[in-house]
Amino acid sequence: MTNIRKTHPLTKIINNSFIDLPAPSNISAWWNFGSLLGICLILQILTGLFLAMHYTSDTTTAFSSVAHICRDVNYGWIIRYMHANGASMFFICLFLHVGRGLYYGSYMFSETWNIGIVLLFTVMATAFMGYVLPWGQMSFWGATVITNLLSAIPYIGTNLVEWIWGGFSVDKATLTRFFAFHFILPFIISALAMIHLLFLHETGSNNPSGIPSNSDKIPFHPYYTIKDILGALSLVLALTTLVLFSPDLLGDPDNYIPANPLSTPPHIKPEWYFLFAYAILRSIPNKLGGVLALILSILILAIIPLLHTSKQRSMMFRPLSQCLFWLLVADLLTLTWIGGQPVEHPFVVIGQLASILYFMILLVLMPITSIIENNLLKW
């Protein structure tokens, strides 16, 4: 008798995705981040659901409803901080996941990669709208500044911004619709993640060497289920440590001041995970140019497969490309730091240089270096 796991229509899907899935025998801990992102998403949906039970999306009561969650709801404080810091963990995992894809050439699976880019944009949109909901100073002014960027679009810009706001400024209508979108988007992300997995399982996983591993596959369970549990425990440990010891470490103190349209905070800045893109936006003096650079800073990932000039897939055996990759990482950390600094003399120039270097590495230096490496190997 065949195992029900392999025959039942529902369990068959789970079996082929998580149990009997043939996986390369040499994938490292860098391949853990997919499952960690799944855990983050589930955690965010659950904590978000419980927060939504007590939150009110009205400008007069939003701020006090968040205070009520933290003060009066049973364990409300831990749910709120798990959700806020869970977003940070989500983005840490996302950046590492994308970095892994760049390093090991996983972008050669074009459908999986492109859906991943759509997922990245969707998660960023969700996080931005979530940051507006507590209706603190940084929520209000962050929403005002970022939505205002759309006014740079020629001809329709101003109408588009007012349409998104639902009025002539960020107000009650904006908060209500942002809450609605923030609630629905994680479910859309879940659906996209399933499609992401569907396309991945069409090709099978890449591996650190970048060499096809069809001749050497092992079942996903128990090998990688155990490995993923280790990653999950590490993630939960990091998150609970952050939540219980320094829950406001990654937040902005200005968001503990209720939103006031009449007083602008001295430094308007987004959450830390958007700072690199914010720095690129600010480094261009022209408004439309800045908005385009902001979008392209993420959208550039879509043309990475077209710029792959190396005869090898992975960077494992390409030391020159490795140097460039880590230079890119350092550059992104520099941009993140600059995004949190005021617009003053040394920071402006550093931000402009780091922005130029970011696009230079991805568009020019990496393809040229790959060609040089091919020639060095006489390929």
Swiss-Prot record:
Positions contributing to heme b b566 binding: 97, 196
GO biological process: mitochondrial electron transport, ubiquinol to cytochrome c
Molecular function GO terms recorded: metal ion binding; ubiquinol-cytochrome-c reductase activity
Cross-referenced SUPFAM superfamilies: a domain/subunit of cytochrome bc1 complex (Ubiquinol-cytochrome c reductase), Transmembrane di-heme cytochromes
Binding site for a ubiquinone: 201
Binding residues for heme b b562: 83, 182
Cofactor(s) listed: heme b
Predominant location: mitochondrion
InterPro entries, alphabetized: Cyt_b/b6_C, Cyt_b/b6_C_sf, Cyt_b/b6_N, Cytb/b6-like_sf, Cytochrome_b, Cytochrome_b_C_euk/bac, Cytochrome_b_N_euk/bac, Di-haem_cyt_TM
Co-factor: note: Binds 2 heme b groups non-covalently.
Cell location: Mitochondrion inner membrane
Keyword annotations of the record: Electron transport, Heme, Iron, Membrane, Metal-binding, Mitochondrion, Mitochondrion inner membrane, Respiratory chain, Transmembrane, Transmembrane helix, Transport, Ubiquinone
Subunit details: The cytochrome bc1 complex contains 11 subunits: 3 respiratory subunits (MT-CYB, CYC1 and UQCRFS1), 2 core proteins (UQCRC1 and UQCRC2) and 6 low-molecular weight proteins (UQCRH/QCR6, UQCRB/QCR7, UQCRQ/QCR8, UQCR10/QCR9, UQCR11/QCR10 and a cleavage product of UQCRFS1). This cytochrome bc1 complex then forms a dimer.
Similarity remark: Belongs to the cytochrome b family.
Protein name: Cytochrome b
Organism annotation: Enhydra lutris
